[in-house]
Amino acid sequence: MSFSYDQARQFGKTYVGALNTGTEAFAALFAPGAEVSVAGDPSDPQGVRDVTPAGRSGFRGARLDPPHVVLTVRVIDPASQSVDDRPHRLTFDASGRITRLEA
């Protein structure tokens, strides 16, 4: 599926909303058998949630890098009073579900 910039931004808001909501909401964004990696290592949707904690993650922006959409997710660390903007590179199937995610 090919996204426009506006669609990518809207999906980014949905993505971070699901990330902050819970395991089931986030997992529902993925196609069966989706490839997921975190910091280059094989993972799963829960692994992504582990490194982008619910309640401390926000949508920062989207950009198109065909065939990928790159979302920037901001992770807030209140203990160190810092923020970290992390790219999440996604590929989608024809129905708009994530088939590949590199976080």
Label for each model-derived stretch:
Residues M1-A103:
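C-terminal and inter-domain tail/linker signature
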